[in-house]
UniProtKB/Swiss-Prot annotation:
This is Large ribosomal subunit protein bL25. GO terms for biological process: translation. Keywords: Ribonucleoprotein, Ribosomal protein, RNA-binding, rRNA-binding. It comes from Caldicellulosiruptor bescii (strain ATCC BAA-1888 / DSM 6725 / KCTC 15123 / Z-1320) (Anaerocellum thermophilum). The keyword Kinase does not apply. Part of the 50S ribosomal subunit; part of the 5S rRNA/L5/L18/L25 subcomplex. Contacts the 5S rRNA. Binds to the 5S rRNA independently of L5 and L18. The gene is rplY. It holds the Pfam family Ribosomal_L25p. GO terms for molecular function: 5S rRNA binding; structural constituent of ribosome. GO terms for cellular component: cytosolic large ribosomal subunit. Disulfide bonds: none annotated. Belongs to the bacterial ribosomal protein bL25 family. CTC subfamily.
Length: 200
């Protein structure tokens, strides 16, 4: 069963109140969507960090507002400029029947097979924007490198998409380049060492 993050309303907006919430183990937040203009609140630091570690930025999660379960995106995460801890979070509440636009990571599978083929992967893109209904949005897109046996350019149009999902960017954009790996000169170095030893 998917965990549900409890979203608590916040009615006090002073800086001292925000600091108090953080000391008590909460993260100040704001939630917004089609039917919610802007709702200040706060969430459990421990529970949010657990979900954030699993889902990442733009990850799709379940949150409970006034006892009603909603689907939301982790839209923005602000961290302290020196300590690095999370100090504020934005959630975008999703409408199940309305398409959304979101950046998702691109994952390369079976990259280790390229080395055995004398090839190397040069990444050009790490994320891509996609469009689809909230229920169809994947956590990431996958490119399987098993089928690549020679140098080539992998483009966005080569990515296999889940049903109901579209890429909003130029499909001719290069995601990664598979190239011939560099040949080392170790044998020549060994020969030079032997020559030096003989001359000595």
């Amino acid at each position: 069963m998917e965990p549900v993050l409890v979203y608590n309303r916040r009615d006090i907006f002073t800086k001292s109140n925000l600091n108090k919430l953080r000391k008590e183990g909460y993260i100040p937040a704001v939630a917004y969507g089609d039917d919610i203009k802007s709702l200040p609140g706060y969430v459990s630091k421990k529970e949010f960090e657990k979900l954030y570690h699993q889902k990442g930025l733009a990850g799709k999660i379940k949150i409970s507002i006034d006892g009603k379960e909603r689907t939301a995106l982790i839209k923005e995460v602000q961290t302290h400029y020196t300590k690095g801890n999370i100090i504020h979070v934005d959630f975008q509440i999703l409408s199940e029947n309305k398409p959304i636009y979101v950046e998702v990571p691109i994952i390369f599978e079976n990259a280790e097979i390229l080395k055995s083929r004398g090839l190397v992967l040069q990444r050009q893109m790490d994320t891509v924007e996609i469009e689809g209904l909230p229920k169809d949005i994947p956590e990431h897109l996958v490119i399987d490198l098993m089928a690549y046996e020679k140098p080539t350019a992998i483009k966005l149009k080569d990515i296999k998409l889940p049903e109901g999902i579209k890429i909003t960017e130029d499909l001719d954009e290069v995601v990664a380049v598979i190239d011939v790996s560099e040949i080392t000169e170790e044998p020549e170095v060994e020969e030079k060492k032997e020559e030096t030893s003989s001359n000595a």
